[in-house]
Amino acid sequence: MNTQSNTYTFLYAAIMVVVVAAVLSFTSLSLKPRQNMNKEIEKKQNILKAVNVASTPANAVELYDKYIVKALIVNVEGETTSNDKSETFKVDLKKENKKDLAVRKLPVFVFNKEGVGEKLIIPVRGKGMWGPIWGFISMESDRKTIFGATFDHQGETPGLGAEIANAEFLAPFTGKQIFDQAGVFTSLKLVKGTASTNPHAFDAVSGGTVTSKGLEAMLQDNLSSYEKFLKSSK
């Protein structure tokens, strides 16, 4: 075949497209198991972080298996629909939050460590200023007091909304309460400068008002779904 012809050029280009596509597809398939494993490890690290257990990618799985003694899926009525630990871990909040509340799967992770006691860990997911925000809230044995919290984000502004992931912002959540003395669900409300004296409120991130409001909505929308479960567990 004449290598200078248009036909040759077309065939050569077509073959190269097929070859490159095949290589990229193979690479993607080869990397996917590792990418999935990394996501699993990161999620387990974040669950542990909500109960103040420090972990690394190397020991996160071991610590998760040791301290997360049980995992449940409950519904909005507070009923347990599954106690399969693996199934609970795989629940995708992004998908679940798009469903009607009546059919939504609500994951609960049960932590227990000698000297610390049992805590419930609840995942949360919502919207920040520039993209999704998410995290985990751990509850004391009274099922109304927050033991710990961890939040993360996809694209909030560094130094502003991104501060929701920093330890300084997270620390004041410990001891906050999502039910009042009468047992009415309050969640946590966004305030400016007075949250330290209010057990049902948190301070906004300086310069990150939109992200803070998104966090407030995330806590309200997600934690309210667990109201009956938390009350039945007391």
Model-derived segments and spans:
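Flexible, solvent-exposed loop/hinge segments and secondary-structure transition points
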Residues: 2-234
